[in-house]
Regions:
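Signature of multi-pass transmembrane helix bundles
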Residues: 5-13, 20, 32-35, 66-73, ...
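Anchoring transmembrane alpha helix of integral membrane proteins
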Residues: 1-47, 53-56
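Transmembrane helix boundary and interhelical junction motifs in multipass membrane proteins
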Residues: 39-43, 194-195, 266-274, 288, ...
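Membrane-water interface of transmembrane alpha-helices in multipass transporters/channels
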Residues: 16-23, 61, 209-217, 244-255, ...
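Juxtamembrane helix-boundary/capping and inter-helix hinge elements in multi-pass membrane proteins
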Residues: 50-59, 94-95, 161-167, 175-178, ...
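Helix-loop-helix junctions within the multi-pass membrane cores of secondary transporters/permeases
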Residues: 257-339, 393
C-alpha cells in the first residue's frame, strides 16, 4: 500500500505519470476484473450452501428459528446503521457534478450505468428479478438479482427435498465452493500487486486533489466508528438488557476471540477457538455453541454488511449518483442477503460488494478507490462478525 503511494508520487514528481498510466495501472485493472470474474459463481454457490445448511432447522426448529431471527435482526440493524451513517456524514460528497463525472471516466472508460431510458412501472423491479434465461443472466454482473433469485429457488428446493435426495448435489455445491474459495485465495495473493497498481494510479489520477484523500479519510472513519459501535455498544448493551450479564465480564471473555479474528481476518479460521472459548468463559452449552456458531460463521456477517452498505453509498456519492428509493431498498435487501452468501475468509466481502454495486448500477471500478485501505478495515469487520456470533449464541442460550 505504502509502496504504491510512494511510486505514484515519484513518477508524478518526475513528470513521468504516463509510465503509471500505461504500465502500472493495467495491473490494477486486471485485479478488478478478477474480482468481477468470480462474483457470480461465489454468490450462487454460497447462497445455495447457506440456505441448504438450514435443513437442520427441521430437527432444531425452536433453536433454529430463534437463531435465524436474531441473526437477521442484527444484520438488518448493521446495514441500516451503515446506510444511515454514510448518508448523514456524506464522506463522498466532495466534488461538483462535473468533477464527479470526470473522475468516473478516469477510473473506467468502459463503465455504463444502468440508467433507465424510459419511465419504469412499479412492478418492473420485481419482474426483472426473474430471469427468462439463466445463462444470459449469469453472463452479466448487472443481473445479479436474477442469480440470487435462482440461488434462492435451488436452496429452498434442497431444504424441502431433504438431505437424502439431495446429498449428491450438495456435495457438488460444497466442492464447487471450495474450488471458488481457492480461486479467491489465488486472487488475494495477487492483491498486493493489484493494490500497489491501484494506489499508484490513484496518486496520478487525483494528483493535487486533496479532496479525494480527505473523502477517503472520512470514509475510513465512518466505517471504523460504525464497527466499533456495533462491537462495543450495540451488542453489550442488548446483552445487558436481555440477559443481565455483566458487560465487562462479557467483553473480557470474548477479547481473545476478537484478537484472533483481527489477526486472521477470517470468521471460519476463528470458529474452533470461538466455540471452545464461549463454552469455557461464557458458560454456553455445547448444543447451543455447536449449532449457533457454525451457522453464524456462514450466515451472520454484521460487520461485513455494515461495511458493504457504506462502501456502496460512498462510491455512489463520489460519482455523483443519486440513488432512488427503490435502489436504497435494493442495497438494504442485498446487503442483508449477502451476509448469508459471504464466505468467512479474507477478501470474500470485497467480491460480494461487487454484487451489490452491480445490482444498483454503480461502477464496480470505484472499488479501486477503497481497496488500498481495505485490509485493516477487513480485520476490524471480522472482529464485529465474530462478536455478533458470540452475542447471538449467548442470547439464545440464556433465553
Amino acid at each position: 500500500m505504502i509502496a504504491g503511494l510512494v511510486v505514484g508520487f515519484i513518477f508524478l514528481s518526475t513528470d513521468n505519470s504516463s509510465v503509471v498510466t500505461n504500465w502500472i495501472k493495467p495491473w490494477g485493472t486486471i485485479f478488478i476484473r478478477l474480482l468481477k470474474l468470480i462474483a457470480i459463481p461465489l454468490v450462487f454457490v454460497s447462497l445455495v450452501k447457506g440456505i441448504s445448511a438450514m435443513t437442520d432447522l427441521k430437527r432444531l426448529s425452536t433453536l433454529g428459528l430463534k437463531t435465524i431471527s436474531l441473526y437477521l435482526a442484527t444484520t438488518f440493524f448493521a446495514v441500516s446503521l451503515g446506510m444511515g451513517a454514510v448518508s448523514l456524514v456524506r464522506p463522498g460528497s466532495v466534488f461538483s457534478k462535473s468533477e464527479s463525472e470526470f473522475y468516473k471516466q478516469k477510473l473506467s472508460s468502459e463503465t455504463v450505468l444502468n440508467v433507465p431510458q424510459k419511465e419504469r412501472q412499479p412492478m418492473d423491479y420485481i419482474v426483472e428479478m426473474v430471469p427468462d434465461n439463466l445463462f444470459s443472466a449469469a453472463g452479466d454482473n448487472s443481473n445479479m438479482l436474477q442469480i440470487i433469485f435462482v440461488a434462492l429457488l435451488v436452496g429452498v428446493a434442497i431444504v424441502v427435498l431433504g438431505t437424502e435426495k439431495t446429498s449428491a448435489f450438495v456435495s457438488v455445491i460444497n466442492a464447487t465452493e471450495a474450488i471458488i474459495l481457492k480461486i479467491i485465495d489465488f486472487i488475494m495473493q495477487f492483491a498486493p500487486v493489484g493494490v500497489f497498481a491501484l494506489l499508484a494510479a490513484l496518486v496520478v489520477d487525483f494528483s493535487g486533489d486533496s479532496a479525494m484523500f480527505s473523502a477517503l479519510g472520512m470514509y475510513a472513519a465512518t466505517v471504523v466508528v460504525c464497527l466499533l459501535f456495533l462491537a462495543y455498544v450495540f451488542y453489550p448493551v442488548l446483552l445487558k438488557i436481555f440477559t443481565r450479564n455483566n458487560i465487562g465480564d462479557y467483553l473480557k471473555a470474548i477479547f481473545p476471540i476478537q484478537l484472533l479474528a483481527f489477526s486472521t481476518s477470517s470468521s471460519s479460521a476463528t470458529l474452533p477457538f470461538t466455540m471452545e472459548q464461549v463454552q469455557q468463559k461464557l458458560g454456553i452449552s455445547e448444543e447451543t455453541a455447536s449449532f449457533v456458531l457454525p451457522l453464524g460463521a456462514t450466515v451472520n456477517m454484521d460487520g461485513t454488511s455494515c461495511y458493504q452498505a457504506i462502501v456502496v453509498l460512498f462510491i455512489a456519492q463520489i460519482f455523483g449518483i443519486e440513488l432512488t428509493i427503490a435502489q436504497y431498498l435494493t442495497v438494504l435487501f442485498l446487503t442483508v442477503l449477502a451476509s448469508i452468501g459471504t464466505a468467512g475468509v479474507p477478501g470474500a466481502s470485497v467480491v460480494m460488494t461487487v454484487m451489490v454495486m452491480s445490482s444498483v448500477g454503480i461502477p464496480v471500478e470505484g472499488l479501486a478507490l477503497i481497496l488500498g485501505i481495505d485490509r485493516p478495515l477487513d480485520m476490524l469487520r471480522t472482529v464485529v462478525n465474530v462478536t455478533g456470533d458470540t452475542f447471538v449464541a449467548t442470547l439464545v442460550d440464556k433465553k
